[in-house]
Amino acid sequence: MRAASFVRCVVAVCVIVMQASVSGAQSLDVYRGVNETQLGWKTPEEREKIIDNMRQAGVGSVRVDLREPFDKYIDSLDLLTRKGLSILMIVQFAEPQLVARDATRRPGRGSIWSVVPLSQLDPEFFREKFGGLWREIERRGIRLAAIEAGNEINWAAFNGDLGLLPPQGQPPQGAPGSVALHDRAAYLLGLRRYVAAVAILKQFRDASVNNRDAKIISAGLTWMPATFAAYVGAEYVDSNETLDILKADGLDAVVDGYGVHFYPGVNQTLSQRNRDFEDLLRPCAVGGRGHSCWLTEWGVRQPNLACPSDESKRVPLIRETVDRIAANVRQKRIGGSYYYDWDDNPIEFTVWRCGGLTEAGKVLFGR
């Protein structure tokens, strides 16, 4: 997402129409979701048009940031609520505004942005700054289906505790699924402080007038081959390893689900895609026991930008992934699913192209 957008163009590293029953008050909207994380940077007219197009396409839920410019992003949340779309709101920890009064960024390189280390996170500063934003969200009557605490905190693009390495390297010996970690102590400290901040989110949610039923989802963790992370020169920690650390720090007591990301590749074999997906969902609940996973990003690349969009390779893989997700929804292993992306960069993944909904988008949203 954004800082990691170049990865989407290379790596095979979000909601859909699901013909599956969903228990309790959980709406089917969160199975017909899509990412549109840049709404706060659009003009009011652009936001209105984008959201109207989404509604007409059959989108049920939108994953959108809460970050600078905060007033514009809250305006976007307000408009989504008034237009009847459900919301998965991401609370970002990669930028200083919610992290600490004196937070500093780790330098970036190229498309890997300069971001704040999670180890700098001051939970009480977060309580103060997020609390003001939350009160405005409540005052406006904005309704949230879920709150995602952070994004891709297990690699260098979104967590400054993870460093940049010489590109085109190789994963170090003895670290399957991960790359480097020159300062593991800082990474572990950052994850502990992250869990403390999520506990504060839960306190606000539990005291809410409008959003007491909103689910709290842990940061969507990226899944990528360690060889690719080494190639681009970025420290990366395996998603399951990171989740195990977070759970040991008390994550399960403060979240309702685990965020995960998945980008299946057209050039992979079916057995490879099945194996990767099962590995991704290893921590997810089976039969409603434990926490389900929320697929807060998944997407399929279509790199030919000519109009009309050539969907011949993408549509079969999207159908395959929709079926795979639906099977896991029925088992209650997946609690929500959001396609990446509606119409923003990287455009190779978007489903709104050439002025309309692509064939891939029609498959996703049942049109």
Question: How would you name each of these model-derived features?
Answer:
Residues 39-54, 126-136, 232-249, 318-325:
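Short, acidic/polar
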Residues 25-65, 340:
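Boundary/entry segment of secreted carbohydrate-active catalytic domains
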Residues 42-45, 164-179, 303-320, 324-367:
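Aromatic-rich peripheral "rim/lid" segments of glycoside hydrolase catalytic domains that contact
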Residues 90, 182-315, 347-359, 366:
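Noncatalytic carbohydrate-binding groove/subsite architecture in carbohydrate-active enzymes
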Residues 1-6:
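N-terminal secretory signal peptides that target proteins for export/translocation
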Residues 32-36, 62-64, 87-91, 145-149, ...:
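Hydrophobic faces of well-ordered beta-strands that scaffold small-molecule active sites
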Residues 8-19:
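Bacterial N-terminal signal peptides
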Residues 50, 54-224, 301-303:
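Substrate-binding cleft and catalytic face of glycoside hydrolase catalytic domains
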